[in-house]
Amino acid sequence: MNALDASHVDITSAKHALPSDGVLACVAPYLAELGFAVEIGKKTAEKIRVPVLYRNNGRVSKAFEADAHHVEGKFVVEVEAGRAVANNQFLKDLFQACMMDDVDHLAIAVRNVYVAAGVKNPDFDRVVTFFETIYASNRMRLPRRGILVIGY
């Protein structure tokens, strides 16, 4: 994604240990320029809610939050940092994107390397291997047209 490429020098995990909100803040202007609605804070009005379930008269009864959402492109972006692999956050992102109404594409941005307690963890490689395993095994069909994993 061009948004992360444009911000690479400011967000690369080789030099920085930004939290996910810090990474999102760096790429938000580029995503917004592409037509994405982007989370700008932690208050309810600043979050991006994507419908999951509806009740009578089309009112949303359940929605999940995303870091960025492009309605016309049917695209959701999630930016993760330290807990992407350690806490299986990327799996939660996958599940929620699969439940979202009218979303065909998911991009998950994770650190290339996450350092915890002095140990380097290859988060990007682990997430990619996980998704490759899902697709290669052909045992689980995901209701998405595409998943993009971006390392930073």
Regions found by a protein language model. Give the residues of each.
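Charged, often low-complexity linker/regulatory segments
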Residues: 1-9
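Active-site metal-binding core of divalent-cation-utilizing nuclease and nuclease-like domains
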Residues: 6, 13-17, 30-72, 85-92, ...
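Nuclease catalytic cores
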Residues: 16-24
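Active-site-adjacent loop/helix micro-motif of nuclease/hydrolase catalytic cores
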Residues: 78-93, 117
